[in-house]
Amino acid sequence: MSVRPPGNPTGRPVAISRRGRAIAVAVVVLIILIQVLPRLNTAYTDWLWFGSVDATSVFRTELLTRLGLFVLVGLLTGIAVSAGAVLAYRFRPVFLAQAGLPDAVARYRAAMGGSPAKTLIWIPIVLGVLAGSIAQTGWQTVLAFFNATPFGRTDPQFGLDISFYAFQLPMWRAVVTWVMVAVVLAFLANLVTHYLVGGLRPGAREGALTRAARIQLVTLAGIFVLAKAAAYWLDRYELLFRENATFTGASYTDVNALMPAKIFMFAVALVCAIAFFSAIVIKDLRIPALATVLLLFSALVVGSAWPLAVEQFSVNPNRAEKEREYIARNIEATRAAYDIGDDRVTYIENWGAPSPNPRQAASDTTTLSNVRILDPNVLSPTFTQMQQLRNFYGFPETLSLDRYTIDGEMQDFLVAARELDPSALQANQRDWINRHTVYTHGNGFVAAPANRVNEIADDAGSDRGGLPNFQVSDLDTINNDQEMMIPVTQPRIYFGELIAQSDPDYAIVGDNGEGPREYDTDTTQYTYTGSGGVPIGGWINRTAYALKFAERNILLSGLINDNSKIIYDRDPRDRVQKVAPWLTTDTTTYPAVIDGRIKWIVDGYTTLKTYPYAELSSLEAMTADSTDELGGRVQVDEEVSYIRNSVKATVDAYDGTVDLYAFDESDPVLQTWMKAMPGIVQPESEISEELRDHFRYPEDLFKVQRELLARYQVDDPGQFFTNDAFWSVPSDPTVTSSIQNPQSTPTGGPLGGPAGGSTGGTGGTQTVDREGPSQPPYYVITSDPADPESDEPTFQLISAFRGYEREFLSAHMSASSDPDTYGEITVRVQRPIEPLAQGPNQAQDIMIASPAIAEDRRLWGETAEVTEGNLLALPLANDSVLYVEPIYTQRKDQDSAYPRLLRVMVSYDRAVGYAPTLYEALRQVGIETDPNLVRIDESGEAEAEAEESSGRPGAETSSPRPSTPSGTGGASDAQRGAAIDEINSALNAVRSAQSSGDLGDLGQALDDLQAAVDAYQALGNGN
């Protein structure tokens, strides 16, 4: 017996009053306005912004594609759902018994009987809006599908062009997925409606389903199974970029078991769909029920159990041989997808002299004369303190490196734009007028030669010396007609990374009729005259931006008139990504002076994650290194299996103009997007020579290729499977070492071995894997890797490789940034001789284990903070690798303190040099060169006088060391091993003494360590 709800004895639907309806309608309209108006305002301001950068076509193409997808998918989804419900209602039973029904069902039936359209209309609308909202996010997939460009390269399994996987397969997968979802929604709508109108009567004696219900439900189920069959067919192709334990791509099991299983499941699904459709004419639901069981059973046995059995009983016992063919496919595809094939990478096998020769190393004058001693990751505070000018100017935490031709010679510089730093404004400078109409721009371009300081610094307690030799181009130098090494005609900076860090980052500029208002210098104001920015004089635009930034002053301020503009989105990287949303940009942008104007250069990548057999990798993980801790940008968390630096972009620092240039016109992904959005990317021929001279090989691409080359330099699939020929990217020794903590000691032995352990005389072939972030690559000027005897300097991005889970040096990678050889990668594979060449961490260990360095560290640590600069691994001639590391000090407990270069450490063939000058440090390891060639100061004094300065603080007292002679005069491996053991023992003693705090014991331990090092070096001298 049913019970009617209290207060409604009739059981009829409760009528809503006219006032109640009006209130309900008003609430709905208000909700819609709250949701829709901000989106309409955003769309309008975006349209204005794109117009200000001449990229309206991008906005229009994206908007129309999104709207088209929203309407099409939303409409089709709504039609599918409503059709399922309407058909069920249309073919409802004529005579419907109400007795015995739950009250809720009875009320719904009564409501639908009176006005079914009003009852049913909201469900399809809501579901259609949701489906359309989800579908419009795939607008890039649709555009790529309709503008696909062939790769001219096929996959090894199906022989299809790579473009099918890149552009077509994602679209077909999206269509099949939508069909399955739409059919499920229609099925549920049909099922529920049939239940409510009586077409589905569970427990009824005369049958649970009416004929109409049976036909409609089995038809929808059959369509779903057909879509599932299509999904099985597409699954075969997606196996080609499936991740396996060893590699990406279809494995032996995938090709020989899972692919046939997918075909079998495709056939079974077709049969099952026919079985479902047969129930339209055959009144027997056991047929589709059996079909469902068959499909599930086949999926379990054929789709899962069979491939698992093949994996366990056929592949696992002989996996290396079984997977050989498929690993070879992965190697070939990965090299092609990441542009690290033989056409791009040159391997120099057995690089390095059997016995390092300092004289031969000294012949590489191009590299030695350009050794970089200024670290862009350390010296930002120095730039800020010495070149800030005003409290509201600033520099990024990490400076940039670029090169300029000065007096006909290439010179690398630390460079930075002096930007406005809104976070540094004082309280009286932070009101709305000052923040957005007065303090609007930065001033100047600051550079410093990377291999020079103003003068040599001897004392950590002194303020003299060790500072960059600044070359400034700003308003003062222009107004005073001062000579500029790097001339700039427009030094004002309205767009940059630092100024964009404020929230919101907009400025309102233009002639307000009352004269210049913007701060320029202490004695002058300025009015922006650039082409960039959105006109904001009209009330419509003012209202739109007042809503966008939630700022009423934009509406009320009398400083805004018909000449006013608003500039925002001032981060160069964000501007490029907004104009080209299909690009992934490099995390590093850098300023360059091009034709007298400061321009930000941004590297843009085209990427895919569906390249068959190519290694699928995380961009964020592969580009992470120790510089992330400095607050730098982190790459997007996106997985890719293909990458190209296809676009070089510039953003004018004054007016924000965005220019995109095709840099790899052969890239099919770039070609696809140039067809989808014509006119946005300029052809490569439009790149000026001056701009091309400042292009750098991008860091993020280099890091990705470096990580992959560590494994994919292996040609043999068998070696690839066993990992025994892999390399590794070393951890950053300047982060993992302890030079910044005077009370601690190195974490490894003097040659990178475990503390207190023997390396067996092999030069450090231990299996300890260093913890810590990866060492970043470094920009340097060196001799040509392909022709080290040439005097022509080249601008290279370099990195070392260590052995797999070893610390010795395995190889050295460099990528050229020179216009004529841009992108050519050279890998010097270290000659496998004993003792093995030092890796970066081993070189770091042996340098900071030097007694002279340890003593200086102890003394300086009382009053100053000691910071290590970047450890550069520089191949010299065809000889060996020279490690160079600058040391900086900064006074403690002073807000205005800043780092200064105090010492230079070098390591060559396990010998250590340590001095205030590079020349002295090189002499200590036996590399004699022209003192004027490697002079690092600008005092004008030749460093030949430095030969008498061995008594300077911090200078090593050892004499120049020639190379180890060959033959009987050299030390045996056993002698070397014993000497290394002595050094390790001495290091342990130093650690113990430091832990105890006994200065007497520490002094004795340091003396013992010095004696052990001297004994080891004596073996190298053949004594």
Label each residue range with its predicted role.
Residues V3-G20, A26-G51, T56-S996, G1000-N1021:
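Soluble extracytoplasmic regions of secretory-pathway and membrane proteins
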